[in-house]
Design a protein with these regions (language model features):
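Metallo-beta-lactamase
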Residues: 1-86
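Conserved hydrophobic helix-helix packing surfaces used for dimerization/oligomerization
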Residues: 23, 108-110, 193
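Short N-terminal or domain-adjacent regulatory/targeting segments
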Residues: 77-104, 178-179
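Short gly/ser/thr-rich secondary-structure transition/capping motifs
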Residues: 93, 140-146
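Residue-level signal for short, function-critical loop segments
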Residues: 114-116, 167
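Short, highly selective alpha-helical patches that border small-molecule cofactor pockets
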Residues: 119-123, 127, 176
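Short helix-loop-beta junction
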Residues: 124-139
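Helix-loop-strand module that forms the ligand-binding subsite of alpha/beta enzymes
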Residues: 145-194
Length: 194
């Protein structure tokens, strides 16, 4: 027998184990994008899924993690993605990092838009300088051409974000505006922004 853990603002309630089965039916929690018949690293697609689907609900997820800590869990069954049966501490730790808006890895994301290529040159030059100065991870994202969800994912993964853009009709370039709005909608915080 299972009973639901009420988590406000989650698409579906998570169900906590109450029997000997020790299964957490996690609804959208611990889900990920991708096919189940393809072996791949869980974290990348789960991170993208989290910040695309669940990310703005960090506080309710934190509350859920606290409630779930009172149960012995041997299996996590999300609606989307594989059933998790091994090294559950790894998955729970990542969810704790993501839902508390903590930095997962040190690194810099340079997100840019460029109309004539000059802002792109500046972004690439900055990436080169950062690498020369010893920054171990630098990711450069062209917001007009690269995957939007991956840009959001990287912004939440790393501790520093640099935004480089042009103006458009006396305003922020539309792709940059969409990116900033996407970060704001997901409660982006605890990062250094330049």
């Amino acid at each position: 027998m299972v009973s639901p853990l009420k988590v406000p603002r989650m698409a579906r309630p998570l169900e906590a184990p109450k029997s000997k089965d020790k299964i957490l039916f996690s609804a959208d929690g611990f889900g990920k994008f991708g096919a189940l018949d393809v072996e791949e690293d869980w974290a990348c697609e789960a991170r993208r899924y989290y910040f695309g689907i669940v990310g703005k609900y960090g506080t309710p997820v934190q509350n859920l993690l606290k409630k779930a800590a009172n149960f012995e869990i041997e299996k996590i069954c999300p609606l989307h993605g594989p059933i998790l049966t091994e090294n559950l501490g790894y998955y729970l730790n990542l969810y704790n990092i993501w839902s508390s808006y903590s930095v997962e890895s040190e690194g810099v994301v340079i997100a840019y838009t460029s109309v004539y290529g000059n802002t792109k040159k500046a972004a690439l030059k900055l990436a080169e300088i950062l690498k020369e100065k010893g920054c171990s991870k630098v990711t450069v994202t062209d917001l007009a051409r690269d995957d939007f969800a991956e840009a959001i994912e990287d912004a939440f993964r790393y501790g520093k974000l640099v935004l480089a853009t042009t103006t458009y009709n006396s305003d922020v370039f539309p792709f940059m505006r969409s990116f900033v709005d996407g970060l704001r909608e997901r409660q982006y915080q605890n990062r250094t922004i330049g």
